[in-house]
């Protein structure tokens, strides 16, 4: 649904259909794959966390859960900061080297701060799944999708393509904040056990 609303909303902002699809394609088809490519390491790593957290949770090893959570989140934070800085600094070279188009660099620089939030959110979701909070992860993701659709529907016609970029930021920040809040709540609850 979201992918159908974006070009429609961009056209309502005054962009013609070809320009709206080109802009959307540059961000989702070119910039986002570069930003998300390093996340394959995080996804592989975080998928290994789910059974480990489940085992610790089932065995009531709550202090181990906290220690592993801190280590994993700090490592993810450091990795995502490095990736974010590299993509920001080398955005021109990456866009020319990969796509032979300099205009993609602008979107890489704009979206690079989101790397930290997106990568941490992936790890937090894996930790939550391991702590038997899969339903909470699903609820947050559904809420995030609905918020994203609302922002795209209402913001993009007013602000144009900038509204789409803003909606990406807001959506990712909301998802990260809700997931992080849920994880903190679970870790505090485990602290009392």
Regions picked out by a protein language model, each given a short descriptive name:
Residues 1-37, 95-97:
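Helix-terminus/linker motif at the lipid-water interface of multi-pass membrane proteins
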Residues 2-6, 34, 49, 53, ...:
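Hydrophobic/aromatic residues within transmembrane alpha-helices of membrane transport systems
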Residues 24-31, 67-80:
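Junctions where cytoplasmic loops transition into the N-terminal start of transmembrane alpha-helices
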Residues 36-59:
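Helix-loop junctions and terminal segments of transmembrane helices
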Residues 82-100:
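Short membrane-interface helical motifs at transmembrane helix boundaries
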Residues 100-124:
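Alpha-helical transmembrane segments of multi-pass membrane proteins
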Residues 115-140:
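Membrane-interface junctions at transmembrane-helix termini in multi-pass inner-membrane proteins
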Residues 132-135, 145-177, 185, 189:
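Membrane-interface helix-loop junctions in multi-pass transport and translocation proteins
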């Amino acid at each position: 649904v979201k992918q159908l609303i974006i070009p429609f909303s961009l056209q309502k902002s005054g962009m013609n259909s070809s320009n709206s699809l080109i802009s959307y394609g540059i961000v989702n088809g070119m910039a986002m794959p570069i930003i998300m490519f390093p996340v394959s390491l995080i996804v592989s790593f975080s998928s290994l966390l789910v059974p480990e957290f489940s085992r610790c949770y089932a065995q009531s090893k709550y202090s181990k859960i906290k220690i592993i959570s801190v280590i994993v989140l700090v490592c993810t934070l450091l990795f995502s900061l490095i990736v974010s800085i590299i993509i920001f600094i080398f955005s021109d070279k990456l866009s020319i080297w990969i796509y032979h188009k300099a205009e993609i660099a602008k979107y890489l620089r704009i979206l690079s701060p989101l790397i930290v939030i997106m990568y941490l959110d992936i790890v937090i979701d894996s930790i939550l799944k391991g702590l038997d909070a899969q339903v909470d992860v699903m609820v947050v993701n559904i809420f995030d999708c609905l918020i994203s659709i609302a922002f795209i529907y209402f913001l993009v016609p007013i602000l144009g393509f900038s509204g789409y970029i803003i909606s990406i930021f807001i959506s990712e920040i909301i998802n990260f904040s809700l997931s992080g809040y849920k994880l903190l709540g679970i870790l505090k609850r485990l602290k009392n056990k």
